[in-house]
Amino acid sequence: MTLLGQNVDSYLWYGGGLKKDFNKATQMAQATAVNFSQLLEKVALKFPEMRIRFSTSNPQDMTLDVVRTMAAHSNICKHIHLPVQSGSNRILKAMNRQHTREEYMALIDNIRAIIPDCAISQDMIIGFPNETEEDHKDTLSLMEYVKYDFGYMYSYSDRPGTAAGKNLADNIPETLKSKRLAEVIAVQRKHAAMHTQNRVGKIETVLVEGVSKKSEKDLMGRNNYNAVVVFPRETYKIGDLVAVKITDCTSGTLLGKAISHTKLSS
């Protein structure tokens, strides 16, 4: 089960109405309101044998209550998609993002203090208008600090109707965008390879999602950290929870051998 939203951490249910009007609600409505960490816990308790994910979290709204709820329940995946967009405060301000580099890094530290091996993924926009080489280096250094498990990286392009598209000239040459994007991707691949290598030899609980694209003799699924795991099909099928011993890896995929069926509570 995936709890999905553009910004799931801003979820607040108090019987109906907009979040901005919460202070106008009755005392009873406010006292019985449900925020995202509470919703996540309710779902985890209701479906103990169902794997639960959520996405996406915005850094300014991500609370440590959510992280503590993740840590408390084995059926909540230990992965947070936490878009940062840039490692430069100057560019973040130009993007109208509501977090700074320092606030983001502090959030990462706090997440890992609660769940040390929590997988963290990112979105990154490269070549935003007026991005300097120093801004680009700030992005690379942030990536080295966080060491993301995986990410989604794109070069900037004008989008009609956006504030940037209306007010900022797309003034970074495409060749320079491509160069910087390649450097960002290289850093991400290095960190992804490190994370997958660290899982070799471990036993992972894998939820089978389908047949491997490379061979019908293999199945693929994801572990508790949202990493793709491929293993021989044998008698297992889509929807099974399988204990898989990881024997090898690529930069983005874990390879293994099935041991047995398993349960999230085991």
Language-model features, listed with the residues they occupy:
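Residues at the N-termini of beta-strands
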Residues: R51, H79, F150-S155, T253
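Terminal RNA-binding accessory module
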Residues: A164-S266
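C-terminal, non-catalytic macromolecule-binding modules
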Residues: E134-S178, V184
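Short, ordered loop/turn segments at secondary-structure junctions
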Residues: Q6-V8, Y156, E234
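Short beta-alpha junctions and helix-cap segments that line functional grooves
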Residues: V66-V67, T139, F231-P232
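Generic alpha-helical structural signal
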Residues: S37, E41, M105, K137, ...
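Conserved SAM/AdoMet-binding glycine-rich loop
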Residues: M1-E133, E144
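Hydrophobic, well-ordered secondary-structure elements that form the walls
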Residues: L82, D123, M143, G151, ...
